Swiss-Prot record:
Naturally occurring in which organism (per UniProt): Synechococcus sp. (strain CC9902)
Alphabetized NCBIfam families for the sequence: membrane protein insertion efficiency factor YidD
Intracellular or extracellular location(s): Cell inner membrane
Domain of life, source organism: Bacteria
HAMAP family named among the record's database cross-references: UPF0161_YidD
Protein's job: Could be involved in insertion of integral membrane proteins into the membrane.
Family from the record: Belongs to the UPF0161 family.
The protein's name in its UniProt record: Putative membrane protein insertion efficiency factor
One cellular component (GO) term of this entry: plasma membrane
Its membrane topology: Peripheral membrane protein
Coiled-coil regions, chain positions: none
């Protein structure tokens, strides 16, 4: 049986951590861009509390870029006129 390259090489976890930080920074920057430049043009449209962009920021900060990004994508796809409004916090 062979060892996983992530576990056998001490540098691998640092590479993954660096990648995760870069992906998280990119996602947070995209949300910041949306909040600064696009959202003011569109006006308030989100059906949920917190707003989808606030949800995305919190989800990525709490759960990291991969799970937080997935939760954010699912939330944005639920934000349409056929979904009831309401409170939809980031899950633990």
């Amino acid at each position: 049986m062979h060892e996983s390259p992530i576990l056998s090489n001490g540098d691998q976890p640092n590479r993954w951590a660096g990648l995760n930080r870069r992906v998280a920074a990119l996602l947070l920057a995209l949300i910041g861009f949306y909040r600064t430049f696009i959202s003011p043009l569109l006006g308030p449209r989100c059906r949920f509390t917190p707003t989808c962009s606030a949800y995305g920021l919190e989800a990525i900060q709490r759960h990291g870029p991969w799970r937080g990004g997935w939760l954010t994508l699912k939330r944005v796809l639920r934000c349409h006129p056929f979904t009831p409004c309401g409170c939809d916090p980031v899950p633990d």
